[in-house]
Regions:
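N-terminal accessory beta-strand-rich subdomains and adjacent acidic, glycine-rich linkers
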Residues: 23-186
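Sec/Tat signal peptide C-region and signal peptidase I cleavage site
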Residues: 14-19
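Sec-dependent N-terminal signal peptides
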Residues: 4-13
């Protein structure tokens, strides 16, 4: 019953009852990602527990072979979710031994019945990452991304810490941009 309630809330949040919508989470069920095609525009949303972390936010690409930010549909029947687990070690990072437990979700988008791209999500207990996987279109051998329309919409009242981005090749030993620049609370 809770699963149906969450799905109904997600559909209402996107404002389109007939939009294709998929939802996936980590095994702890706290971090939930919802992907939909809101009137032909791909969007995603991230919730953590009862809190909206990212409101419905745009996905998409403008390329030399087409505008894939609108007029496309999420293909629910081809949606796939699988667990990811692994271990790696890097001696030069703060936590040198890392165990990975995550969920991989492949969200396929189509235009006029043709597979355009997948948005491949990697969701762990406290992280969300995604990438685009493009598919060949006709005889075009190369797809050039002219603009990415991906964005994120923070909920009303969100507070953040913003850090100015240093220009490249500046700072000590020309190592900028670095993450040690000053920041102020908003």
């Amino acid at each position: 019953m809770k699963k149906y309630f969450l799905l109904a809330c997600a559909l209402g949040a996107f404002g389109v009852a007939d939009a294709a919508t998929v939802q996936f989470s980590r095994p702890d069920k706290k971090l939930v990602v919802t992907v939909a095609d809101d009137g032909g525009r791909p969007v995603y949303r991230v919730d953590y527990g009862e809190t909206t972390f990212l409101a419905p936010s745009p996905l998409g690409l403008l390329t030399n072979i087409g505008d894939f930010s609108q007029g496309i549909a999420l293909q629910e029947s081809s949606f796939a979710v699988s667990p990811v687990s692994g271990h790696y070690e890097l001696p030069t990072i703060k936590r040198s031994k890392v165990d990975v437990q995550a969920t991989k979700a492949v969200c396929p988008f189509y235009e006029d019945g043709k597979h355009i791209f997948d948005v491949v999500f990697h969701v762990s207990d406290h992280d969300v990452a995604f990438k685009y996987k493009m598919y060949p279109q006709g005889n075009t051998l190369c797809c050039v991304v002219k603009e990415e329309t991906t964005g994120f919409v923070l909920p009303q009242g969100t507070t953040t810490f913003l850090c100015p981005q240093a220009g490249p090749m500046g700072g000590f030993a020309r190592t900028s941009p670095s993450y040690e620049t000053s920041y102020t609370a908003d």
